[in-house]
Regions:
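Conserved Class I S-adenosyl-L-methionine-dependent methyltransferase catalytic core
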Residues: 17, 62, 67-160
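Conserved SAM-binding loop
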Residues: 198-199
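Conserved SAM/SAH-binding beta-strand->alpha-helix loop
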Residues: 191-193
Length: 337
């Protein structure tokens, strides 16, 4: 098959790449500012009125909508913004763009430095933990929740104490508290900004007396100061951070340590995206490239599904069921006991 293109085609393609890069940032901003929700509900909005109502800089708001229009997400008719042909799909995947740009933007911006081995020492990259928590709350809701609730409904018991490793915004514990009125929750989170966000969230939603958070690293669970509360936990969850346990020898040790730290856990729900295998470069779906490349830059090993299957028994757990998630890269929720 010929790969030749005309100069005109090449220029247009490169312009589209450039504009799509700008639009990618605008998607996360439009979501966070409420524009995507308003467009999803009403089908249109007035950009000038939207800017004035939300105390936003009008020329910059116009630029944001222009970026979205350049790739068919919206259409512009003067100051009126209408949904475009790709709006629904973008609105569904908006949190993935937010994770990439608002949450991980600094990592990708510094790519030339991060790729140099001489620079890969100490804290050689930065990400915005609060922005990542903001995005991951909706990513979890839209992609992991169906599998999560399927696992919860099949527990066969009513938990009394739940712990969430890498608890982020606290949404997972809030969901569990809503489902089981008598349950208490404990979140273990390494990022102070995420804990601050989570504490505000649980207080706002009326769960401040049932859900609490402690700063700690699930990979070093023995160092977490809430160890005395772990023995009460009978349901353990961990979503979108299990890959941080790897490489293999670390994953086995971390799983063993978690098993020992939570001796009375009856079910451990572990959900994460895994590394894909064999997808042609031009057929990669949304999120996959950013997730895998981003973690490669951070030096975080991403296991495949088969590699996960190979560590549970050695790590002190038995996998009783797997819930495959095909809508987000190659993701899964493991039920462990």
């Amino acid at each position: 098959m010929s790969t030749e293109v005309s100069d005109t085609q090449a220029r247009r393609a490169v312009a589209d790449i450039f504009n799509a890069t700008v639009a990618s940032h605008a998607i996360g901003a439009a979501w966070e500012l409420g524009a995507l929700d308003e467009l999803g509900e009403n089908g249109k909005l007035d950009a000038a009125e939207f800017a004035a109502r939300n105390d936003l800089h009008e020329p910059a708001v116009t630029g944001m909508f222009t970026a979205l229009a350049s790739v068919g997400i919206v259409r512009r008719e003067g100051t009126i913004v209408l949904t475009g042909p790709y709006f629904d799909e973008v609105n569904h995947t908006r949190s993935l763009f937010h994770w990439l740009n608002q949450g991980s933007g600094e990592l990708f911006r510094r790519m030339p430095e991060v790729l140099r081995n001489e620079k890969r020492v100490g804290d050689f990259y930065q990400r915005d933990a609060a922005a990542i928590s903001y995005a991951c709350r909706e990513i979890s809701e839209r992609y992991f929740d169906p599998a999560f609730w399927s696992a919860v409904e099949g527990l066969g018991y009513e938990p009394t104490m739940a712990a969430d490793l890498g608890s982020g915004s606290g949404e997972r514990l809030i969901q569990i508290a809503r489902r089981f009125p008598g349950v208490r929750g404990l979140g273990v989170e390494i990022a102070p900004d995420a804990i601050t966000m989570a504490e505000k969230e649980v207080a706002t939603k009326g769960f401040g007396d049932r859900i609490s958070f402690v700063r700690g690293d699930a990979r070093d669970i023995d160092a977490v100061e809430a160890r005395e509360r772990f023995a009460d936990v009978d349901l353990l969850t961990c979503f979108m951070m299990g890959h941080d346990f790897w490489p293999r020898e670390n994953a086995v040790k971390t799983l063993r340590d978690i098993r020992a730290a939570f001796p009375n856990v009856r079910r451990f729900l572990l959900g994460d995206a895994t590394r894909t295998v064999g997808i042609p470069d031009r057929e990669l779906p949304v999120f996959t490239l950013g997730f895998e490349f981003g973690h490669d830059m951070m030096g975080v090993y991403l296991p495949t599904m088969d590699e996960w299957d190979g560590v549970f028994e050695e790590g002190g757990w038995r996998c009783v069921k797997k819930h495959a998630i095909d809508s987000l890269s190659r993701s899964v929720v493991f039920e462990l006991e």
